[in-house]
């Protein structure tokens, strides 16, 4: 069986930067998981004593340094963190900071804000918090906008890990129904590249293995694209692989989410070779 990796996959710039920051910040804690990959979080805790807490209240008084996760945190939480006697190390991805800045600036100019994304995702919770008013609407589908009467001046941004075609559905609806719509394409280039690469590979493979955290938005997007073209599975570790998946298969494609380290990809490929 041929095992082929997608042309573009795995650690993106923002995640690589955050992991390097964590490795250089031994004994620090992160506010929320640094990235959406439990095995990499486990490695950082084991090798560098960089652990995470869920809330500011959970930060022990002995902690000297706190790392802000790649997804960013809400503005009020950042302010609360500044009031504590700790050094703040900001590992927010620069591509995530961009929609934060846009939302802050456009809301100051009086624009209603439409955000394409998952309102429960930490990145979006952070982006929302930068609006200076409460006319902020987070949607995943244009139908969610039908019952809302927006002002005539609208600015829109997208979660960095979403599919561009889904964002276009939102922007097309807004342009058809409102006079002024400022569209900011805040979807990350790495997301585009990984999605294009998985689509290309899935078209010629008869099975795709997508590696990454089950709670990772960008990994789920890769899995959803892959399964449009062939049998596909999303796994976090080699223990989840099953021998029967590979029976009769001739071409196995591999891709991985932006928070998936290369050591994990190689570990899973080794296990596939044993099973196939």
Swiss-Prot record:
Keyword Oxidoreductase assigned: yes
Binding site for dimethylallyl diphosphate: 36, 71, 121, 216-218, 259
Gene transcribed to yield this protein: ispH
InterPro entries to which the protein is assigned, alphabetical: LytB/IspH
Residues involved in [4Fe-4S] cluster binding: 12, 93, 188
A molecular function GO annotation: 4-hydroxy-3-methylbut-2-enyl diphosphate reductase activity
Keyword Iron among record annotations: yes
Entry binding sites for isopentenyl diphosphate: 36, 71, 121, 216-218, 259
One Gene Ontology biological process: isopentenyl diphosphate biosynthetic process, methylerythritol 4-phosphate pathway
Active site residues according to the UniProt entry: 123
Full protein name: 4-hydroxy-3-methylbut-2-enyl diphosphate reductase
Reported cofactor(s): [4Fe-4S] cluster
Gene3D superfamilies named in the record: 3.40.50.11270, 4-hydroxy-3-methylbut-2-enyl diphosphate reductase, catalytic domain
Entry note: cofactor: Binds 1 [4Fe-4S] cluster per subunit.
EC number from the UniProt entry: 1.17.7.4
Binding site residues for (2E)-4-hydroxy-3-methylbut-2-enyl diphosphate: 36, 71, 121, 160, 216-218, 259
Family: Belongs to the IspH family.
Known pathway: Isoprenoid biosynthesis; dimethylallyl diphosphate biosynthesis; dimethylallyl diphosphate from (2E)-4-hydroxy-3-methylbutenyl diphosphate: step 1/1; Isoprenoid biosynthesis; isopentenyl diphosphate biosynthesis via DXP pathway; isopentenyl diphosphate from 1-deoxy-D-xylulose 5-phosphate: step 6/6
Function field: Catalyzes the conversion of 1-hydroxy-2-methyl-2-(E)-butenyl 4-diphosphate (HMBPP) into a mixture of isopentenyl diphosphate (IPP) and dimethylallyl diphosphate (DMAPP). Acts in the terminal step of the DOXP/MEP pathway for isoprenoid precursor biosynthesis.
CDD domains: lytB_ispH
Keywords assigned by UniProt, alphabetized: 4Fe-4S, Iron, Iron-sulfur, Isoprene biosynthesis, Metal-binding, Oxidoreductase
Annotated catalysed reactions: isopentenyl diphosphate + 2 oxidized [2Fe-2S]-[ferredoxin] + H2O = (2E)-4-hydroxy-3-methylbut-2-enyl diphosphate + 2 reduced [2Fe-2S]-[ferredoxin] + 2 H(+); dimethylallyl diphosphate + 2 oxidized [2Fe-2S]-[ferredoxin] + H2O = (2E)-4-hydroxy-3-methylbut-2-enyl diphosphate + 2 reduced [2Fe-2S]-[ferredoxin] + 2 H(+)
Segments passing through the bilayer: none
Top-tier EC class: oxidoreductase
